[in-house]
Amino acid sequence: MKIDLLHKPTEYMETVIILQEENGDIDKVEYLPEYLQNAINIVVKQDDFHFKYSSLKSFPFIRSRKRTNIILCGIGNPKELDNDRFRNLIAISVREAIKIEAKEAYIFTGFKNPLSELHFGHMLAEAALLTEYRFNKYLSEPKSSSLQAIHLAMDLKNPHMFNRGVLEGRIFAEATNLSRDLVNEPANVIYPESLAEVAKKVALKYGFSIEVFGLDKIKRLKMEAFLAVGKGSKK
């Protein structure tokens, strides 16, 4: 999944995610086109929707014979927003985007960001990539997440730190998803020898050193729990 900053306005946006503070003004959301502001204001008023923390609402909007999916997500009081709460909001929003089979999502923010740009990028990338994870390797008709890109429409003082955060978040998410893959594999696929091979490939990919212990050294180190698990496999 591509995650980046929106450098210039685009004429058509397939899916729009609005992260808005409670009692905030949609008309003041950075870079959000006026026609979308008007549409959102109408729905918010008609449905009496409030942007309380983790509140969610999605609806379609048609303009010039093109459909835009709009996802509203409340952040509540921005002063209470921390890394974990923000990560949860991204997960909620991305999950909804995947549910409606969005391919490209644009995130707009209607609050004063209390997080550092490094943490903002990190939480955004990590939450998005963890949310889209699917283990469908053995399905007859595997279906991956439709979401291919997320663009952030936000004025940042230091885009470099945001991009660095996105990179860090991506690394964290990829590591977690790798662990998920290993746990989800059956015992006849992941056993001590094959696990060592996976570890070697990961070390080569990310550039860190690795030492694979043999049976004798594992016994000398008294890694009894590891040995007990390994005995569950014929290999």
Regions found by a protein language model. Name each.
Residues 1-235:
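Short amphipathic alpha-helical segment within the helicase RecA-like ATPase core
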